[in-house]
Amino acid sequence: MGNDSVKDKMKGGFNKAKGEVKDKVGDMADRTDMQAEGKKDKAKGEIQKDIGKAKDKFSDKD
């Protein structure tokens, strides 16, 4: 497991959590702009985590 893959998965987890908070706060405050930003951050986090997992798979084949 490479160091880059760990960083990608950690960044992804952070962005996903940040997005979930923004989404919930935006919902409670009735701020659709904040909700949209939260959904974008969650998607970004998922993609980063997937990239980290893919890097793990490729490094395992070496």
Curated annotation (Swiss-Prot):
State the residue spans of region: Disordered: 1-62
Pfam families under this entry?
Answer: CsbD (PF05532)
Q: Which residues form a coiled coil?
A: none
Protein name (database record):
Stress response protein CsbD
Species this chain originates from: Bacillus subtilis (strain 168)
Query: Per its UniProt entry, which superkingdom is the organism in?
Result: Bacteria
What InterPro entries does this protein's entry cite?
CsbD, YjbJ_sf
* Keyword terms: Stress response
Outline the inducing conditions. By phosphate starvation, via the alternative sigma factor sigma-B.
Family that this chain belongs to: Belongs to the UPF0337 (CsbD) family.
